[in-house]
C-alpha cells in the first residue's frame, strides 16, 4: 500500500478484497457500486447485510441483483470496480484475482465528486 496526498494505491487482489470488505462493513448510509456480477458475487454477504440493516445500496452490474437493493443492468468493463461509500470514500481500479491488480482508494472530496457524477450520469442514462 502506497500513500500519496490522500490517495492510497492498493496492490494485489487479496489486499483489494480486504479493503472492499472493510469499506462495506464501515458503510453508514449508502453504497454505490459498478462492477461485474462475477466480482460482486464475492461480496454478496456484505451487500445483503447492508440491505438488511436498511442502508441504501445501488448496484450497476451486468448480471447481479439483490432484493431490496436498487439495481441497474448495464455493461461492465472486465475486472473493473467503482465503489463509493457514504459520499465520502471511493475505490476504483482492477480486480482480476492476481497480485498485479491495482486500485486507488481515497477520501479526497474532488475524486469522490468526480466518481459520483460519473455514476449519476450512468444511472440517468440507464433510467431513460
Predicted regions and their residues:
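PLD-like (HKD) phosphodiesterase/transphosphatidyltransferase domain
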Residues: 1-49
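C-terminal regulatory/effector modules of DNA-binding transcriptional regulators
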Residues: 36-128
Amino acid at each position: 500500500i502506497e500513500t500519496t496526498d490522500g490517495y492510497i494505491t492498493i496492490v494485489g487482489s487479496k489486499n483489494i478484497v480486504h479493503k472492499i470488505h472493510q469499506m462495506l462493513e464501515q458503510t453508514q448510509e449508502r453504497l454505490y457500486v459498478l462492477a461485474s456480477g462475477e466480482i460482486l458475487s464475492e461480496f454478496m454477504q456484505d451487500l445483503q447485510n447492508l440491505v438488511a440493516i436498511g442502508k441504501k445500496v445501488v448496484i450497476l452490474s451486468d448480471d447481479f441483483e439483490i432484493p431490496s437493493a436498487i439495481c441497474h443492468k448495464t455493461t461492465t468493463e472486465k475486472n473493473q470496480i467503482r465503489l463509493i461509500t457514504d459520499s465520502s470514500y471511493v475505490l476504483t481500479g482492477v480486480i482480476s484475482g492476481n497480485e498485479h491488480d491495482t486500485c486507488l482508494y481515497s477520501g479526497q472530496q474532488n475524486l469522490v465528486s468526480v466518481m459520483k457524477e460519473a455514476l449519476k450520469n450512468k444511472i440517468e442514462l440507464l433510467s431513460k
